[in-house]
Every structure is written in structure tokens, then in C-alpha cells.
């Protein structure tokens, strides 16, 4: 038995590539939100891609005053991205520090009806550049919860989400808006950091993220989330204090629920399975059906992400770009008609041409606003939906690795038991041989010569020094070290170590069996919640998409009918 096998309880079993997950930390004193300071843990994992419409949605500036009513916020499925009381009343695009309040109100209305959280609806009221401790500066987002405000950076939102995924590995933690691409930083790093459209997009989506977290009892009751909203809490201290600082380095070597408090010594014996491993098909038993259910859920999430992120989103983005181009053409055409009206000597004809030019200008403004509202009410939630699919796949991946962990532990335990049986059998055979030799010697007795005199002692033979190659002393030493001088002692030592490893694996198997039951129940429950939420969000997106186009078409129809009446009255 090699040194590796001596020290590794999983040696001799199926060895698969290992995958690890890293840690972060969490924090200090009581929060102003500490209405419930109990740590409630439950689950989630990493995030995935998905594009954004914020660029196309705001490539054109603000508008003048069109009177299109937006999607009704009184609906039970009120869209968290819908601007609630927002109308197609063309106000200029809000500055970084003065966002359109109606978007925040709509989000709050949705989250208030969807949750019984003790935390009031959350708003991000502004985004400002801050120069504290640096000459270059950074953007901070002002979060308002009731009468209390706190400023946080994007990187702090990012670390919050990472921490939540480690604390709740079986929970579908909402995604946050994407980072800048490497290309953006390479081309114009300063512009990438301070891009107004990106900041406004992040402001809206970070508010959606916080309110979605607020709707999840596990997160809203979590002290880490409450301290994130506490203006008196230092976030760096939160990340370096319990419960975050007590989270294990590898989430797979911890229980699925409350991993910062419920870790046992047995968890340290668990293997880290490959992320690409396949759970064995157990046929028609209950466990087999459950594995089939999760495999189908993973397949569906992957297909949904491909349909949304790789298909629908790209096409919708192209359409928004075309609307943007058309709006620009309408603006130019309206100006040409107005110039033409000034050239007309007939005042009646000049007024008619000017009326047509005004209709075209109105069409430009309406199309401009359509692009912006489609980006906010349809594009942004669509991109978030693609990100959610990636989050679901990450949670399912964690659950699958927990199932693989159980299989690996069971296989390793069985292999070690076979090894122990083999060693014990060899030890028993060796003992029988030694006993037989002992009996043979005792039966023969000491031999004597006929004269009764002891024979003269012959010189003792030289003790063999083992394997030798003349002139190669170092090589001789290496070979001699490899040769087992006392195989019986080595075998007994191997038996002792194998028994110890079997004891560790039996403990590991027990916690692995408990963990997979908890993980399966928790993931399945959260998948049901997420599916209902996704269905409601999809209805909101479709309704918003239809409403934006209907209001845009009605506004244009009224404008062109007014122009037609002017022309026909000539």
C-alpha cells in the first residue's frame, strides 16, 4: 500500500476530478433593521450571463410631452420594471442623481404585494460620484429603506450576492446587472466607469435585485442582508465577521442549510466531485425519479437561457436599434418639412406643410420614447430572465455535486472494506503459516551428534545488505529503502489505517445522506417558487411589450389623423 493510499480515505475507489468553491466573509453589530436577527439559511450559487438593453433604450435623448398611458400598475402582476405611474409624457432622460421616481414606485408596489417582509420597500434614489480616499473617484448608489439611507458601491453589491450564494447554496439568489466588458475598459476605461446609461441601468436593476432579495424570507431575515442596508455598518467589517468569516472554504464540505454553523468534522472527510460528473441512473426507484426530475430541470434551464439570451434578446435588440434609427430619420424629415413650410408663399399651404412636419416630429418623439420604455420594461427584465436561467443551472449543479459526493463516498467506503478484507485475509494466512512452522520446529526438537558433543560453531554468515549494484551507492540506498524489511509490520499498520479510514468514511456517508435529502427538498421547493415567479414576470414583460406598442400606435394615429384633417380642409 502506497503512502497516498495510507493517508487518503478515498484511495482505491473511483477518483474523479475535484472542483472547489471559494469563500468571502460577513459582519458586525446590530442593524437598524434588526427586527429579526436570527440567521436563516437556505441556498444558492453563482450567476450567469445575459445581455442588456440599457444601451439601445437610451441612445436617443429625452422626449417632449406625449400623452401615452403606460401599463396599469394596479395589476396583480405589476411589472417590477414598469414605470407604474409613468406615462408617455416625454420628459428628458433623468440625470444620474435624479432618476425617474415612477420606476422606483412601481418596483416597490410589486415587492410590497409579493412579500410579508419586515423590511420596507427599497429604493435606490440616486447615483453619485464619490472621491473618498481616491482621486479618481467611484460611483456610489444611495439606498433608501423607509427613512434611512445608506450608500454602497457596485463592488459591495457584488460581494453581497457572492456571500448570499455561499450562505444559501440551494436558493436561487437574484442576479445583479452585468459588469463592463473587458473591451469597454480597454477602449475607454474612464468612460466605461462613468457611462451614464450604464449607471442608470445599474441603478434600476440593483433596486430590482434588493427588492427581490427582500421578498425571500431566508435573505430578508439574514443578518448579512440587514447589515448591508444599515448605514452604521462597515461592509468590510461585515465580510470579516461571523457568520461570513465562519463559512467553510468549500461549500460542498458543508451542509446545504446554515453552512456557517452546522459544519461537523465528518464534512471534512467528504470528497469534492467533478462539476462534469454524471449521477448514476438508479432505474425506477424514488431516487432515480428525483434525479430524472432535476436532470430535466437543468436541461430546461439551459434551453431557456439559449432561447432568451441567444435568440429573443438579440432579435429584440436589433429591433430597438432600428426603431432608434427610424426616430433619427423622423427627426431629420420633420426639420425638412418645417424648412419647406417657410419657403411656401401661400400661407394656407405653408400651415398644412408645417402641420405635417409637426406630425413627423411627434412621431419621432413617440418612437424615441417607445425605444426607451421597451428597453426598461421589456429589455431589462428579459436580460435578467436569461441571467436567472444561469443562476438556476448553478443551483442544480451544486445539488448534482452533492449527489455525486454521496456516490463517491459510498464507492470509497466499499473499496476500503474490500481492501481491509484482503489485508485481514493475508494477515490470517500469514498467522496460520507461522503457527504451522512453530509446531514443526517444536516436534523436531534440538538435534545432537552421536558423541553427545556439540559441533563446533561455524562462522556466522554475513548479513545480506539487500540489493546492490557495485559503484552505485546512492542507487543501492534507494532500492533498499523501497524494499520492505518487515512486511508483516507494514501489513498490520495498513490494517490499522484502513480501519481508521473506514470509520471516517462511515461518518462522511452518514452526513452525505442527510445533506442530499435536505438539498433535494430545498432546491425542489425553490424551483417551484421560481417557476411561479418567472411565469408572472413573463406575463408582465409581454403585457408591457404590447402596451408600449399599442400606446405608441394610438399616439401616432391621433397625430396623423389630425394632420390628415388639416390637409383635407385645404
From Swiss-Prot:
SUPFAM superfamilies: PX domain. Residues 98-236 form the PX domain. Residues 1-31, 81-115, 429-498 are annotated as: Disordered. It comes from the Eukaryota. Signal peptide: none annotated. The PX domain binds phosphatidylinositol 3-phosphate which is necessary for peripheral membrane localization to the perivacuolar punctate structures. This is Sorting nexin-41.
Amino acid at each position: 500500500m502506497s503512502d497516498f493510499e495510507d493517508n487518503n480515505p478515498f484511495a482505491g475507489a473511483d477518483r474523479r476530478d475535484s472542483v472547489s468553491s471559494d469563500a468571502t466573509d460577513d459582519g458586525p453589530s446590530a442593524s437598524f433593521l434588526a427586527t429579526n436577527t436570527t440567521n436563516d439559511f437556505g441556498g444558492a450559487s453563482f450567476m450567469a450571463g445575459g445581455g442588456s438593453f440599457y444601451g439601445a433604450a437610451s441612445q436617443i435623448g429625452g422626449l417632449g410631452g406625449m400623452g401615452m398611458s403606460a401599463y396599469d400598475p394596479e395589476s396583480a402582476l405589476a411589472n417590477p420594471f414598469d414605470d407604474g405611474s409613468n406615462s408617455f409624457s416625454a420628459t428628458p432622460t433623468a440625470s444620474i442623481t435624479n432618476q425617474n421616481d415612477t420606476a422606483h414606485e412601481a418596483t416597490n408596489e410589486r415587492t410590497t404585494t409579493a412579500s410579508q417582509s419586515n423590511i420596507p420597500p427599497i429604493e435606490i434614489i440616486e447615483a453619485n460620484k464619490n472621491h473618498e480616499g481616491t482621486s479618481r473617484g467611484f460611483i456610489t448608489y444611495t439606498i433608501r429603506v423607509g427613512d434611512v439611507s445608506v450608500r454602497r458601491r457596485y463592488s459591495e453589491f457584488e460581494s453581497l450576492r457572492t456571500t448570499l450564494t455561499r450562505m444559501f447554496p440551494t436558493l436561487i439568489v437574484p442576479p445583479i446587472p452585468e459588469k463592463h466588458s473587458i473591451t469597454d475598459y480597454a477602449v475607454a476605461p474612464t468612460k466605461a466607469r462613468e457611462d451614464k446609461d450604464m449607471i442608470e441601468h445599474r441603478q434600476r436593476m440593483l433596486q430590482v435585485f434588493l427588492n427581490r432579495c427582500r421578498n425571500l424570507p431566508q435573505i430578508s431575515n439574514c443578518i448579512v442582508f440587514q447589515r448591508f442596508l444599515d448605514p452604521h455598518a462597515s461592509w468590510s467589517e461585515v465580510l470579516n465577521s461571523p457568520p461570513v468569516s465562519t463559512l467553510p472554504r468549500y461549500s460542498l464540505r458543508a451542509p446545504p442549510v446554515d453552512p456557517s454553523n452546522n459544519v461537523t468534522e465528518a464534512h471534512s472527510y467528504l470528497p469534492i466531485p467533478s462539476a462534469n460528473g454524471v449521477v448514476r441512473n438508479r432505474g425506477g426507484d424514488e431516487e432515480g425519479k428525483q434525479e430524472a426530475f432535476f436532470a430535466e430541470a437543468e436541461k430546461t434551464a439551459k434551453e431557456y437561457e439559449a432561447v432568451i439570451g441567444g435568440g429573443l434578446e438579440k432579435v429584440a435588440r436589433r429591433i430597438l436599434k432600428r426603431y432608434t434609427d427610424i426616430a433619427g430619420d423622423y427627426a431629420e424629415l420633420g426639420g425638412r418639412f418645417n424648412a419647406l413650410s417657410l419657403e411656401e408663399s401661400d400661407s394656407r399651404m405653408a400651415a398644412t406643410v408645417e402641420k405635417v412636419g409637426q406630425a413627423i416630429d411627434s412621431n419621432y418623439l413617440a418612437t424615441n420614447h417607445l425605444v426607451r420604455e421597451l428597453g426598461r420594461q421589456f429589455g431589462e427584465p428579459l436580460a435578467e430572465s436569461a441571467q436567472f436561467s444561469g443562476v438556476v443551472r448553478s443551483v442544480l449543479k451544486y445539488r448534482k455535486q452533492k449527489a455525486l459526493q454521496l456516490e463517491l463516498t459510498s464507492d470509497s467506503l466499499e473499496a476500503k472494506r474490500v481492501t481491509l478484507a484482503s489485508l485481514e485475509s493475508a494477515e490470517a494466512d500469514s498467522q496460520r503459516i507461522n503457527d504451522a512452522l512453530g509446531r514443526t520446529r517444536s516436534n523436531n526438537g534440538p538435534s545432537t551428534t552421536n558423541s553427545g558433543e556439540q559441533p563446533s560453531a561455524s562462522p556466522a554468515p554475513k548479513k545480506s545488505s539487500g540489493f546492490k549494484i557495485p559503484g552505485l551507492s546512492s542507487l543501492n540506498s534507494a532500492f533498499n529503502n523501497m524494499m520492505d524489511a518487515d512486511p508483516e509490520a507494514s501489513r498490520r499498520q495498513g490494517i490499522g489505517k484502513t480501519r481508521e479510514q473506514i470509520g471516517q468514511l462511515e461518518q462522511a456517508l452518514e452526513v452525505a445522506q442527510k445533506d442530499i435529502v435536505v438539498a433535494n427538498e430545498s432546491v425542489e421547493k425553490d424551483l417551484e417558487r421560481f417557476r411561479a415567479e418567472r411565469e408572472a414576470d413573463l406575463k408582465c414583460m409581454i403585457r408591457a411589450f404590447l402596451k408600449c406598442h399599442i400606446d405608441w400606435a394610438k399616439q401616432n394615429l391621433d397625430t396623423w389623423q389630425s394632420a390628415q384633417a388639416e390637409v383635407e380642409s385645404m
